From Swiss-Prot:
It is found in: Mitochondrion. The lineage of its organism: Eukaryota, Metazoa, Chordata, Craniata, Vertebrata. Its main location: mitochondrion. GO terms for molecular function: structural constituent of ribosome. One of its GO terms (biological process) is translation. Belongs to the bacterial ribosomal protein bL34 family. Residues 1-46 form a transit peptide. GO terms for cellular component: mitochondrial large ribosomal subunit. It comes from Macaca fascicularis. This is Large ribosomal subunit protein bL34m. Keywords: Mitochondrion, Phosphoprotein, Ribonucleoprotein, Ribosomal protein, Transit peptide.
Length: 92
């Protein structure tokens, strides 16, 4: 009976019947096959990444500026070390 129904259906319906209803599955499971040949779910898109660095000139100058460098002995060493190396920019 299935063979008879398959022969009566058109080519598009027959290909859908051969897929075993795969076109009815959720779209997330129709990903590319993984190393074992199994379909993998698509990656969730809810979480954003890579936006941790939001530059602020005030914070940059306060942390790495000339006044902050000269206010501590370690900062003076940083300036002298950069002078010795020949850096054009000694601080921010």
């Amino acid at each position: 009976m299935a063979l008879l129904a398959g022969s009566l259906l058109g080519p598009t319906s027959r290909s859908a019947a051969l897929l075993g209803g795969r076109w009815l599955q959720p779209r997330a499971w129709l990903g590319f096959p993984d190393a074992w040949g199994l379909p993998t779910p698509q990656q969730a898109r809810g979480k954003s990444r890579g936006n941790e660095y939001q530059p602020s000139n005030i914070k940059r100058k306060n942390k790495h500026g000339w006044v902050r460098r000269l206010s501590t002995p370690a900062g003076v060493q940083v300036i002298l070390r950069r002078m010795l190396k020949g850096r054009k920019s000694l601080s921010h």
